Amino acid sequence: MTAFLIRSIIAALCLTLIVLPAQAIRETDSYDGNIFALYAGNGSLVPPAVTLADSLQAGRTSVIVYYLDDSRTSKAFSPAVSELQRLWGNSVDLLPLTTDALQGRADSDRTDPAHYWHGIIPQVVVIDGDGKVLLDEEGQVPLEQINSAISQATGLPAPQGESMSLSFNELNTEVISR
């Protein structure tokens, strides 16, 4: 009887210790973690290296991307943000910002990211070195449109050709410009 109880307890412990695999699904509004690491293969995008205030003060081109980690539209757009970093590198300040901290907050001035946010995600704002907004679009903004605004802001040529998405598994998609 004692042996049976011990075996039963061990079996119950083994069953409770079995960990189910984590599941991340791009087509849901569930929180899966850092969307850039998970869906774009680029966890280096967040947190941004500089603030909007620092970028504007330095006279650099700022590219703000408003997103939420638990939004299917943000998950789908994350590879495009990663591609922007690949294309423009150190020529622009790329600022992917989650909107959680902006909700219900009044904007103060043009150095505050809340000043530009409309309440829709994803949203892309391109601001040139003089503080002029060259692009302010919501949704799945085409990469070519963003590249054109960045080119106008920086004076650097935009990549030629169209972008295309390559999906190499059920989670990751890569956007490339050709």
Question: Where in the sequence are the language-model features?
Answer:
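N-terminal "domain-start" segment that seeds a small globular fold
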Residues: A22-T51
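Thiol-/selenol-based redox modules, centered on thioredoxin-like
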Residues: G139-R178
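Thioredoxin-like thiol-disulfide oxidoreductase module
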Residues: S82, D93-V133, L143-Q145, I150-T154
